[in-house]
């Protein structure tokens, strides 16, 4: 089922009900974040876009180190963490709301929530590059290991998109 009209959307914080968001995630993602959430919930905040009926999209903003970082994220993310960039992880759009700009609306809502903040994130699917680039993120690093491809993106609040060398 594809929902064509969205009348009302709200950005909501899920402080005490993380499972509501975790349940919409792919099973692999649930296994990654679920077991460690208790240990990192003070460092992360779940934001969801919802209408009156359900969660349409959501993600987690980490103000410090995200959990379960890969070696690529550890090495390349350190300078951004040191500069106070927030990490965006687990951005997911529900199947009924895909191709309706919900991911872009979620990112825009987060940028509006933190107007003076810069962000970083990583992707493991190259097909997502265009999505993040059209939302103002710049690719600043690419893993050299073909068995575990990853790309790091940054969004700077001043829109300069510089690369830390």
Please state what every model-predicted region is:
Residues 13-38:
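Conserved GNAT-fold acetyl-CoA-binding loop/helix
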Residues 90-93, 99-112, 134:
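Conserved acetyl-CoA-binding loop-helix of GNAT-fold acetyltransferases
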Residues 112-125:
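Conserved GNAT acetyl-CoA-binding A-motif
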Residues 147-164:
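Charged, low-complexity C-terminal accessory regions
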Residues 1-22, 163-165:
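Conserved N-terminal entry element of GNAT/NAT acetyltransferase domains
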Residues 84-87, 161-165:
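Long, low-complexity, intrinsically disordered N-terminal extensions of eukaryotic proteins, enriched
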Residues 28, 35-90, 98, 146-151:
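Conserved acyl-donor/pantetheine-binding loop and adjacent beta-alpha core of acyl/acetyltransferases
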Residues 125-149:
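Conserved active-site alpha-helix within GNAT-family acetyltransferase domains
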């Amino acid at each position: 089922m594809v929902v064509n009209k969205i009348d009302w959307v709200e950005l909501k914080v899920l402080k005490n009900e993380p499972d509501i968001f975790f349940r919409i995630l792919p099973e692999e993602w649930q296994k990654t974040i679920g077991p460690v959430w208790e240990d990192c919930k003070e460092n992360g905040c779940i934001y969801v876009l919802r209408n009156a009926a359900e969660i349409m999209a959501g993600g987690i903003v980490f103000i410090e180190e995200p959990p379960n970082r890969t070696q690529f994220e550890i090495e390349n993310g350190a300078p951004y963490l040191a500069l106070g960039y927030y990490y965006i992880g687990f951005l997911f759009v529900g199947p009924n709301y895909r191709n309706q700009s919900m991911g872009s609306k979620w990112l825009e809502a987060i940028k509006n929530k933190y107007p003076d903040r810069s962000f970083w994130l990583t992707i493991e699917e190259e097909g997502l590059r265009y999505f993040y680039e059209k939302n103002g993120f710049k690719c600043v690093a690419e893993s050299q290991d073909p068995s575990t491809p990853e790309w790091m993106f940054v969004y700077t609040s001043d829109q300069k998109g510089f690369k830390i060398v």
